[in-house]
Amino acid sequence: MIKKPRGTTDVFPEEVVYWQRIESCARKTAAKYGFGEIRLPTLEMTELFQRGVGDTTDVVQKEMYTFQDRDGKSLTLRPEGTAGTVRAIIENGRCSDALPLKLYYILNCFRHEKPQAGRYREFWQFGVEMFGAAGAPADATVISLANSLLRTLGVKDITLHINSIGCPKCRPAYHAALKEYFSAKKDILCPTCQGRLETNPLRILDCKNPECKELAESAPKTIDFLCPECEAHFASLKRCLDAEGIEYGIDPMIVRGLDYYTKTVFEFIAPVVGAQSTVCGGGRYDGLMKELGGPEMPGIGFGMGINRLILAMQGSGVTLEPDDRPALYIASMGEKANETAMGIVEALREEGIHAETDLCARSLKAQMKYADKLGAAYTLILGDSELASGTAKLKNMSDSTQTDVSLSDIAALRSLVTE
């Protein structure tokens, strides 16, 4: 038996209903905030993520699915959506669009991680990106959008954690403080973080190794090294969130796992998910557009994991069932009755009615059992006598009442099965 690759999922109708609810609510919420949808290629040039996400990140060093195509070009299955969105804006000449430019996407991403509950190698994200607005009100707007969606979906006990990781002006002093702190404890660091100590000490704060995490808790905090501009930006963000009535906590451990972030970073935590409790994460990336060859243009956005959102909804007691019960099932006996039944159900389908009939040459008893299993609201038995009279009995499956109907009056039949 051929099995699916590790870390991927098969999603059947009873769970797809959660995906559909999330996607529908995400689109409606994004539209309320003025965001339009963008669709991006699954494959990108590897250089995009090396330059955009950062060479020293776990994503680039350990997690990307990268290969050479037949032309010898290095391609990568996208591990996230922000870099591709920026690339699309630059490549298609959209930097001169009216600002702020607001875009959202729903897409699958790929990372070679250890699969566990809420963490997959192919995972889906709803993400938003806003370009051209440098102030904290833009940050608060993006956070508000995420907050609104999570509450619309019924996720309980959500908490918002915010931090500022500074900008290129103030980050060197912070990097120096981190390097000094971790150098004294280098022997305790994992081999990967010992290398990060020289290349990018900020990434040590994002390490999942227990010893490194414990050391990171006592490390210097970013908010103690902010320049006046970043301090003012963070203070403005807090005032905006207060004005919007959005509760938050300051978490100096949030640095996010991608190098393009500047100033504001944030996460929404849903404890009902379990160990992988971050259901949304994002921040500001004011230098990414220029880094990838475009003009200087500030950006702010987030990614929300759909797989984890489903766990959060289910853990919060949100129960959804597929709305796929047929309004009518026609049980037919004989070739002529089968053909007539096919014509009736197709006419009803043209009217937007979910109707079914037998396709497997079942006995009448087996057909009625199948109709009950489908949860059909009404059934109609069609045989030689019904064909001869041109009428049949329509049975309401909930109360067993029966009504005579004309086989030629599709409008009347439609009216009865949609009452």
Can you annotate each of these PLM segments?
Residues M1-K365, Y370-A412, L416-E419:
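TRNA-recognition modules of translation machinery and tRNA-sensing kinases, especially anticodon-binding
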